[in-house]
Amino acid sequence: MDATDQGKSTSTTAAQAAPGKAAPRRGIGRDALVGGICGAVVVLMIGASYAAVPFYNWFCRATGFNGTTQVATAAPSAAPLARRIGVRFDANVAGGLPWKFEPEKTEIEVAIGEVVTVYYTVTNQSARTTMAQAAYNVTPLTSGAYFQKINCFCFTEQTMAPGETREMPVVFYVDPAITADHENDGLNTITLSYTFYPVRDAAPKPVAAGEPDKPRGSL
């Protein structure tokens, strides 16, 4: 092989080797792109999971899904119907909350469309101030969209002093529109259920707050 052929061979070898050196750079770029896409998907999924909680709560309140009751601003304008329905009251306390919680009446009968006030009694059985929030629903779940609360202790957090007992009212009515919903044909009883969950410990008050200073003995 003469010098000219050797030069051509060397040039050809170099040209063939060049793409081989560039390949790793293309691979790294492709991996970085895939990694970036995966990271973006993870971030979007995390964001969606947080957004799903308030959206789910709003959806339940708006539709009565999963037995979530509705919030009414006023009594119905029409007169109550002749049809009557039973309403049962259930009370529960989550673990770790030292409260006694029970309805004054476990069951009543009301006219559909009638505004009714009932009471639950709550006692803080501990020696410290505690706070809790009540979660609620009704069964059967199909009745949630028609159980309208005008006022309820469950709308806000409740703070109870040590040993305090309190009556907590619920003002509600069953929407007459329930009679047009065939899913609730033959419905005779609705159960309203509450469960109190601890929120956090209230800031303890100093034992000697408001008391006059006491003389100290000699050291």
UniProtKB/Swiss-Prot annotation:
<feature type="transmembrane region" description="Helical; Signal-anchor for type II membrane protein">
    <location>
        <begin position="30"/>
        <end position="52"/>
    </location>
</feature>
<dbReference type="GO" id="GO:0008535">
    <property type="term" value="P:respiratory chain complex IV assembly"/>
</dbReference>
<keyword id="KW-0735">Signal-anchor</keyword>
<keyword id="KW-1003">Cell membrane</keyword>
<feature type="compositionally biased region" description="Low complexity">
    <location>
        <begin position="14"/>
        <end position="24"/>
    </location>
</feature>
<feature type="topological domain" description="Cytoplasmic">
    <location>
        <begin position="1"/>
        <end position="29"/>
    </location>
</feature>
<keyword id="KW-1133">Transmembrane helix</keyword>
<keyword id="KW-0186">Copper</keyword>
<protein>
    <recommendedName>
        <fullName>Cytochrome c oxidase assembly protein CtaG</fullName>
    </recommendedName>
</protein>
<dbReference type="InterPro" id="IPR007533">
    <property type="entry name" value="Cyt_c_oxidase_assmbl_CtaG"/>
</dbReference>
<dbReference type="GO" id="GO:0005507">
    <property type="term" value="F:copper ion binding"/>
</dbReference>
<keyword id="KW-0472">Membrane</keyword>
<feature type="compositionally biased region" description="Polar residues">
    <location>
        <begin position="1"/>
        <end position="13"/>
    </location>
</feature>
<dbReference type="GO" id="GO:0005886">
    <property type="term" value="C:plasma membrane"/>
</dbReference>
<dbReference type="Pfam" id="PF04442">
    <property type="entry name" value="CtaG_Cox11"/>
</dbReference>
<keyword id="KW-0997">Cell inner membrane</keyword>
<comment type="similarity">
    <text>Belongs to the COX11/CtaG family.</text>
</comment>
<comment type="function">
    <text>Exerts its effect at some terminal stage of cytochrome c oxidase synthesis, probably by being involved in the insertion of the copper B into subunit I.</text>
</comment>
<feature type="region of interest" description="Disordered">
    <location>
        <begin position="1"/>
        <end position="24"/>
    </location>
</feature>
<feature type="topological domain" description="Periplasmic">
    <location>
        <begin position="53"/>
        <end position="219"/>
    </location>
</feature>
<dbReference type="InterPro" id="IPR023471">
    <property type="entry name" value="CtaG/Cox11_dom_sf"/>
</dbReference>
<keyword id="KW-0812">Transmembrane</keyword>
